[in-house]
Amino acid sequence: MKRIFSGVKSPKLSAPPKVFKNDESPSTPSSPKFDQGLRSLSASASRLFSNSISTPGSPTLDLPQEHSINGDISPELVPIVTLLSAQAHRRYHYGIFLILHDLKTDGTPAARQWEECYGVLLGTQLALWDAKELSDSKNNKNTSTMKKAASRPSFINFTDASVRSLDANDQVIIASENEKTKKDLDNVLVVSTTLKNRYFLKFKNSKSFKTWNAAIRLSLFEFTALQEAYTGSFLSSRGVKLGDIKVVMADTKFTYEDWVSVRFGTGMPWKRCYAVISPQSGKKKKNSKGSICFYENNKKTKKSNIMTTVVDARALYAVYPSSPILIDTSTIIKLEGFVSFDKSEEPQETNLFIMPEKHQGVPGYDTIIRFLIPAMNAFYLYGRPKGLIANRTDPDSLLFALPTLPHIYYLQVDDVLSLTKDKNYIHWSAADWRNNIVQVLQKKLSKGYKGCGNKTVSVSSGMMKSPAISSAELFEGYDSLPERQMESPQKSKMKSPTLASTDDINSASASVNSHATSVKQTELFVTDNSSKINDSVSAQSSVTTNFKDTFTTPMTSGMLNHENSERSFGSGLKLKITDSNLENMEDVEAKSANEFSTTPEDKHIHLANAAELSALYDKYSTSPFGKSEANSSPKPQKLEVKDRSKNENRSPYERYVGTSAESKTFEIGNVRESKSTINTSLSSPLRVEDSRRSKNEDLGSLKEFEELSQKISNMGMANISSEALSDTAENSSFVTDLNLNINNSSSVNLNEEQRVPDFGEENVFDPDYMEQNQMLETESRYTTDEFDFSDNQDAASSNYSNGQTNRTVTETLSASDRNDKIPHSSLFTNLNQLTSNGGNYQDREDFSGDQINKPQQSQPLHVKGPQTSSFGYRNSSANSSQPQAPYPVGRPLGKIRTGPLTVQPMQQGGNSSMYSFQSSQHRFHSSQQRQNQSLSFRNNTYGSGNNQNTFHPSPQLQQQPQNMRYLNNKLPINDRSPIPQTQHHVPDGRPSLHINTTNRTNPLTAQSGFSQFMPPNSTSTNPYSS
């Protein structure tokens, strides 16, 4: 049978929503009020990056929620996603500086005019506003103009940018209309987000320059470190799902080949290549590494087809797709290393994006893991191929210096600022900055450092649910700011009236929501003039957004050929800037040096207000972790100033840490101290798990994943329930080894220590399950109405029986018996198949037809008596596929079990519902025994396929005969042994042909052989039919 890989299907993402109307507004889509209605907040954030123009008449669509795909994210990913969200919304620094857009994205000259900007570094994105426009709006006291100016920032993405400081070797030629002068630019950073564009950022003094430089370097370091940590948690949570993970993790000398798409530079198109990962060759030097060769086609034997070769790698990690719903589908890998385009040239330091192509029926995480592991082995990264390093104090580990929650940051800006005391820091490359930051962390880790960041900081729900930057984050200050701003109070650099202070901007932007914080709940409505503005609306300010062409940069994530930029700067940068206005701007700065002052920290708006305002900027109304239910239609966003602890839509960080009103200790729920994620509680039935993964001790190669899982789990404080779950898994050998589940709706009730989480549906993608399913299909031919071979036909014979016979037997079963522990047979891996249909005639006395039709009302049975022999009760728990009808009392049975078998009758009112018999008295004729066994094997081969609610014998009955046969190590193929009959011992060994029917409490003989398949018919002449 063809193997089907496990995993969820790729989600079909719908288009971003355009417009939705308020619940309180009964307007129709054609009404003007609907066209001007409140727009989707997430769509507004996306248009801030895409600069798209909205269409009022577009249909309403919703973004898919994560829990609609695969439920809660893996416990290993919860701390990492929390840290990634916190880093994306961390404000590293803000202030005023000059910017010059030198080259556009296509390499053509830009305006090349110095503009004064107010900038905020939030995560790895620098938001920019025109300082003159903000100042004019403040001084003119024009609220509408102020809102319009505040809601249209431009962004520079530093994620994959090349950042370099100008030094004494760099000369800038400033060409004016009259003359050309050479002038050295001090305190200038050169930023290139693509291979062709370029920006110059000039700061007013050395102090400001060092602070901005340190803040940018720290943001880039934290982003890369968290991507590596995400890769480690991704491997630990998804690696165990691969069926052949043991082979993937093995240290082999074989090459790995696959089709990939490669982007050799930001702004460059994706190129489809055939990648070949070659490990170290035995003929090479001892310290040599492997390589990754990219070919134009799969004819790799031709050397002329080689496009490029990666000869070394400094970092290799999976890129977090910015949203948890895309984790299982994203296959983008970033490689930082040295690439050779020609053998005659020296390798160049650069970054590559690699995206392995997905295969049909294979989930994305399967594809990316199969590429990551061989690539790490080739370049000896993160401890591979020996084993992934899980020690957070090791610089080579994927989890190096990972903050332990509730700490959410690696370092403060002041910690990196201390590195600028080195005189050579201005010449450092990106790798030098990273190495020096690692040294700072190593010193702190040696003293037990666990990270920084306010332990009581409350991250707003908007920050955690959406990668978009909220207006409140851009303007308002909160605890993530550095304790001391390096930007000294300065005046505006322009001739216009003084620039509004940050506190004034806060008050102006906060005034957009009319009395938003003065009431408990406030709903937003779009102003009347919103339809007159062309671009997307900002939900926080309720106005639209326009980007200025001089500031607009492409927001697509990319990377820069770092070697090219280093080569252009290495011998001294020579720039020619025509019509520069730098001198005029410097004159303005000198004249207004004492008029501008930044906002004191004690004037910042309270954090709760900032969190509430930022919540208006986000579309998502449910948690990205799937804890709350998704809504089919978006709801109007609301502000709740009080009782925020009762809000169901709190951010994931708030749900773990708790708000200030709760004073809750930070905990990570459901993060066990176990070595895998197999027995974690899953809330969605779509979550597919492989039961074979429960025995991770048999997979030696998973030790690396287990260590990563433990380290990541230690990032948060495990709760009591997780520890109890781990202890239960260790103490119960049946539950741990076989991954058993108990259906709560069944009649079998277990104690709390025997309960294990319900995994929902069976793993239909498991090859073993499919083989079992094929076996069940074969059995269905014997249970359909067409063949009429089901054991349920025996129910017709129940018309002859007395309905009250032995009814008192079941009434004697006490409640305490139902709560007794019932050990489970080691032959089953899922009790959900065994706990829904009631017992059979082998497990109890005769019942009436009503009792048989209500198997859920049957009582649990317990075995009492000596150990069975090798023949009697042969795995009766595995062969009770369907409830059996009682046989008529007082009528001769068609098939009498031959062979002397002395059995003790059942005691009335006892706790045992089965007959105890002495195995030493079992004596059989060899010919009759072989005949009975052969008939049973033929007729009941698949009798246990759909078995449910089957009685499980006690440990003393679990010993199986040596001649038991198994199919694929799953279910035994054996006969359904009839219940032992009460017969008088005959000295000559011949069986008795008559049954005493006067005592109705005596056990009845069950049919066996072909007679049980004969339909009951009163006119039948078949001597074997009853």
From Swiss-Prot:
Residues 637-653 have a biased composition (Basic and acidic residues). The modification Phosphothreonine is found at T578. It comes from the Eukaryota. GO terms for biological process: signal transduction. Pfam families: PH, PH_26. GO terms for cellular component: cellular bud; cellular bud neck; cellular bud tip; cytoplasm; plasma membrane. Residues 90-221, 254-433 form the PH domain. The modification Phosphoserine is found at S10, S31, S580, S592, S701, S954. InterPro entries: PH-like_dom_sf (IPR011993), PH_domain (IPR001849). Keywords: Cell membrane, Cytoplasm, Membrane, Phosphoprotein, Repeat. It is found in: Cytoplasm; Bud neck; Cell membrane. Residues 916-934, 1015-1026 have a biased composition (Low complexity). It is a peripheral membrane protein. Residues 623-635, 826-840, 850-884, 904-915, 935-960 have a biased composition (Polar residues). Interacts with phosphatidylinositol 3-phosphate. This is Protein SKG3. It comes from Saccharomyces cerevisiae (strain ATCC 204508 / S288c) (Baker's yeast). The gene is SKG3.
